[in-house]
Curated annotation (Swiss-Prot):
The modification Leucine amide is found at residue 59. Keywords: Amidation, Amphibian defense peptide, Antimicrobial, Cleavage on pair of basic residues, Secreted, Signal. It comes from the Eukaryota. Transmembrane segments: none annotated. It holds the Pfam family FSAP_sig_propep. It comes from Amolops mantzorum. This is Temporin-MT3. GO terms for cellular component: extracellular region. Residues 23-44 form a propeptide. Belongs to the frog skin active peptide (FSAP) family. Temporin subfamily. One of its GO terms (biological process) is defense response. The keyword Secreted applies. The keyword Ribosomal protein does not apply.
Length: 61
């Protein structure tokens, strides 16, 4: 039983470090995107394809 605890503990420890690094990277990206122009561009990127699909669906019928 003790032989299983060591690898599991190691995996847990490495996974925790990995998640911590991912959170730091994500927070850094969010800080970079805090500029209003970039935020508006990102909203437009999400919104325009949806509108395009709706219009093509309506005009195609």
């Amino acid at each position: 039983m003790f032989t299983l605890k060591k690898p599991l503990l190691l995996l847990f420890f490495l996974g925790t470090i990995n998640l911590s690094l991912c959170e730091q990277e994500r927070n850094a990206e969010e800080e970079r995107r805090d500029e209003p122009d970039e935020r508006n561009a990102e909203v437009e990127k999400r919104f325009l394809p949806i509108v395009g699909k709706l219009l093509s669906g309506l005009l195609g019928k």
